[in-house]
C-alpha cells in the first residue's frame, strides 16, 4: 500500500518524518499482510514539483508508476481538523477521482475515518482555511425569497 501523507506545512522536517513513521506503523498494524510505504507531501513536492502548483497538485493524484502503470499512491491520509490550500486541492481532487482519503488521529495504532469533503472556511488563510469533514457534508439552508 502506497500512502500520500498530507501533513501540515508548519510541521518541521523532524516532526513530519516521525509522524510518517507512526502512520506507517499504524497502517501496518491494521494491514499486516501488506507492505506499507508512506511518503510525506513535503518529500513528494521536493522530488516532483516542476514550478506549477496546480499541475503538481493534480499530478500527486494522477501520477502513475512508469513500469507498472498503477497509481503512485493507493490512499491519501490527512491529519488535523483543517488544512491549507494545496492539501485541500489534492484531497478534493482525490475524492473527485474516487480515490480513498482518510483522516488519521496521529497516534499508533490510532483511528482512521473516511473523509467525505473538504470545504473552504477562510479563503484568505492559505495554511488552515479549509475544514476536513468526516461525515456527510453539512446541510446548508437555502436563502428564502421573502
Question: Across the structure, where does each feature detected by a protein language model lie?
Answer:
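Conserved catalytic or regulatory cores that recognize and/or transform ribose-phosphate-containing ligands
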Residues: 1-146
